[in-house]
């Protein structure tokens, strides 16, 4: 329970914060204590989902195209993969690793005698490692809140705790965080079934290091929105020989400056009048006198805060640029990003993304090998029908980027290479099966040849009968 409490108190708040920034609940900008408290003024809280943009882009780039698993002929492995939607599972795991820096997969053998994979929530799952030079997992823990009915028929929130080791699964009775754990049931298992996927060796999410920049961008955009709103409420300033709160005004008449109570009352009246002027967007200023004893001019006009458009917009642009730069995520809205860039130029523009993806994929591939190793262990214990050695598997990741395949093929053909027509047909719009196009063209050519032979009177009896034109007699 100490380890669960440690995870709940020390790790879960960080993971929850990362989840909030992914979902657009940027905690810094929406915290009431971090913004203006002035009544009567705009207080917009503009939230920008950079976290979601970064995580979704990195995930789509790396695993948007399905991971290809190359293996020898193995019907049992094909059966297992057909029973699991591994494309979706890989996407969920990669997204969790990108968001939280870690992801968890649980593998079990179902009632259908097939191994199944489930994605666990990183906010309620952790793995305990040994103290070896190369630390190995010794226990996986999952704790999640459930609602239970108490003795007074009232619903209570309690934690359902599960643990796994290499040979035992334990389920505990619902309990509170500070209560004793009581075993509900135990089962014997034959493999450590929980896999921890790491985003990097530090288990840091892709947008975690730019959260301070996201907070600054939120604040800058919010301040701009506040200014644009308050700009419509310009303050009227009247300067002249008027009775205001200044010394010498009629408010001072009959007031003994040495009387503390009267001074406090006068101060309160001044504050009330200042508030009234502020609420009315009006400022009364008493005119003064020049060195020659002449009264200064009387005037009236509106004042408002000056807005440095160029400086403010440049500041926000720098923040947005730094967010993309330090997260290795290209800004797809940048008009200089795409244009008519060649394939090589585009590769340079996303070089940071490609390098980051290489690191992330290496870590993810370790988890994939563990997945099939666990499946092999469970299969060996149950049926021994799996013939593939997990260590012989090859995983291929393909960048999910737009490519100009037609131009590439054109350049290859110009260089003297020959490309099969059936291969080219796959680039036609709405074509899913290039082979069907090839077969259709072959049928059309055959029909044209037959019709030509019929027209020239050289068709065979079979061609004429198949054509349905006429029947000939054989002498």
Locations of the language-model features?
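A short, surface-exposed helix-loop junction/capping segment
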Residues: 71-77, 298-302, 350
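Extended, helix-rich architectural segments
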Residues: 1-120, 471-475
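A general structural signal for short secondary-structure junctions and capping/turn motifs
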Residues: 94-99, 130-133, 151-153, 225-229, ...
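Short secondary-structure junctions and interdomain/linker hinges
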Residues: 25-29, 61, 83-89, 100-104, ...
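Extended, regular secondary-structure scaffolds
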Residues: 104-212
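Extended, charged amphipathic alpha-helical segments
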Residues: 186-345
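C-terminal helix-loop subdomains that flank or include functional centers
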Residues: 269-293, 311-314, 318-475
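Short amphipathic alpha-helical segments
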Residues: 72-76, 81-90, 97, 209, ...
């Amino acid at each position: 329970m100490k380890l669960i409490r440690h995870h709940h108190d020390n790790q879960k708040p960080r993971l929850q914060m990362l989840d909030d920034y992914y979902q657009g609940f940027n905690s810094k900008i929406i915290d009431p204590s971090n913004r203006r408290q002035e009544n009567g003024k705009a207080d917009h809280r503009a939230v920008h989902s950079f976290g979601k943009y970064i995580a979704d882009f990195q995930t789509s780039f790396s695993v948007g195209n399905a991971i290809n698993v190359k293996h020898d002929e193995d019907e049992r492995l094909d059966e297992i993969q057909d029973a699991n939607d591994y494309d979706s599972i890989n996407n969920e795991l990669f997204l969790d690793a990108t968001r939280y820096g870690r992801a968890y997969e649980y593998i079990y053998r179902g009632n259908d005698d097939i191994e199944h994979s489930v994605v666990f929530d990183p906010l309620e799952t952790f793995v305990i490692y040994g103290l070896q030079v190369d630390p190995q997992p010794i226990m996986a823990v999952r704790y999640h809140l459930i609602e239970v009915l108490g003795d007074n028929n009232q619903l209570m929130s309690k934690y359902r705790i599960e643990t796994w080791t290499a040979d035992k699964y334990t389920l505990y009775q619902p309990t509170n965080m500070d209560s004793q754990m009581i075993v509900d049931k135990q089962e014997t298992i034959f493999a450590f079934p929980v896999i921890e996927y790491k985003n990097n060796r530090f288990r840091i999410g892709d947008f975690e290091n730019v959260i301070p920049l996201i907070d600054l961008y939120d604040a800058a955009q919010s301040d701009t929105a506040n200014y644009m709103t308050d700009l419509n409420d310009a303050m009227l300033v009247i300067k002249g020989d008027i009775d205001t709160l200044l010394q010498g005004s009629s408010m001072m008449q009959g007031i003994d400056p040495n009387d503390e109570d009267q001074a406090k009352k006068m101060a309160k009246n001044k504050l009330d009048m200042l508030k009234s002027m502020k609420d009315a967007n009006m400022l009364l200023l008493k005119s003064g006198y020049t060195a020659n004893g002449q009264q200064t001019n009387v005037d009236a006009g509106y004042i408002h805060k000056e807005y440095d458009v160029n400086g403010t917009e440049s500041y926000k642009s720098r923040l947005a640029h730094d967010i993309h730069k330090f997260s290795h995520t290209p800004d797809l809205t940048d008009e200089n990003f795409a244009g008519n860039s060649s394939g090589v130029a585009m590769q340079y523009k996303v070089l940071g993304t490609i390098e980051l993806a290489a690191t992330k994929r290496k870590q993810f591939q370790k988890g994939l090998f563990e997945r099939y190793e666990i499946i092999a262990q469970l299969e060996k214990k149950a049926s021994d029908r799996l013939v593939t050695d997990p260590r012989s598997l090859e995983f291929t990741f393909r960048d999910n980027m737009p490519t100009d395949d037609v131009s590439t093929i054109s350049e290859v053909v110009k260089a003297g290479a020959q490309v099969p027509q059936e291969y080219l047909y796959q680039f036609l719009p709405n074509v899913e099966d290039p082979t069907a196009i090839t077969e259709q063209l072959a049928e059309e050519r055959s029909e044209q040849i037959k019709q030509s032979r019929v027209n020239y009177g050289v068709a065979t009896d079979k061609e004429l009968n198949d054509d349905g034109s006429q029947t000939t007699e054989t002498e």
